[in-house]
Design a protein with these regions (language model features):
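Conserved aromatic beta-strand anchor motif in extracellular beta-sandwich/beta-rich domains
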Residues: 68-72
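Short acidic/polar inter-strand loop motif in beta-rich domains
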Residues: 132-142
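Solvent-exposed beta-strand/loop surfaces of large extracellular or lumenal domains
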Residues: 76-113
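Exposed beta-strand and adjacent loop surfaces of beta-rich binding modules
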Residues: 51, 63-67, 125
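A surface-exposed beta-strand-loop module
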Residues: 106-123, 140
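Amphipathic alpha-helical substructures
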Residues: 1-43, 47, 52-54
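Terminal edge beta-strands and adjacent linker/stalk segments
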Residues: 141-149
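Asparagine-centered strand-capping/turn motif at beta-strand->loop junctions
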Residues: 56-60
């Protein structure tokens, strides 16, 4: 059965079988930080960049690939897909996700945190959500969404 899934998905799934069937480890991810990106000028000073840095944290011991959905003030939605290096491949987006689908660099399973850039200024982001489709068996979803504070 595992080999059928690997053939159909065109990726290695031994790691998933080992974690899911042979351990009691759990899946738990969180949005650890959202901050404006900076860029260094030719004079050496830093200025705000027109993008946002998002840092995710793996709190559980079960690594999984992630889909992080970002929505801006205009209603545009991006899905940042973060594969695991263990997979040696990546998921193909569903047809309705194809526009705005952005594959990121693999997340090495030994690293507890991962940072990526969103091409939108922080003040134009309405929300950032890990696993909007709720397909991930995350044990604590309370830390899976970030929204700007209403000050």
């Amino acid at each position: 059965l595992l080999r059928i899934f690997e053939h159909e998905g065109d990726m290695i799934l031994d790691w998933y079988y080992e974690y899911f069937v042979e351990t009691t480890k759990n899946v738990d991810y969180a949005i650890a930080a959202v901050s404006p990106a900076t860029q260094t000028t030719t004079e050496g000073s830093t200025t705000p960049a027109p993008q946002t840095e998002v840092t995710l944290e793996r709190l559980g011991d079960f690594p999984m690939p992630l889909e992080v959905q970002v929505t801006d003030l205009n209603g545009q939605v991006w899905t940042f897909y973060i594969p695991l290096r263990l997979m040696r491949g990546e998921k193909t987006p569903n047809p309705e996700q194809a526009e705005g689908w952005m594959v990121q660099e693999d997340w090495p399973w030994v690293e507890p945190s991962y940072t990526f850039s969103v091409p939108v200024p922080t003040d134009e982001i309405v929300s950032i959500t890990i696993d909007e489709s709720m397909l991930l068996a995350d044990v604590d979803r309370s830390n899976n969404t970030w929204e700007p504070s209403k000050e």
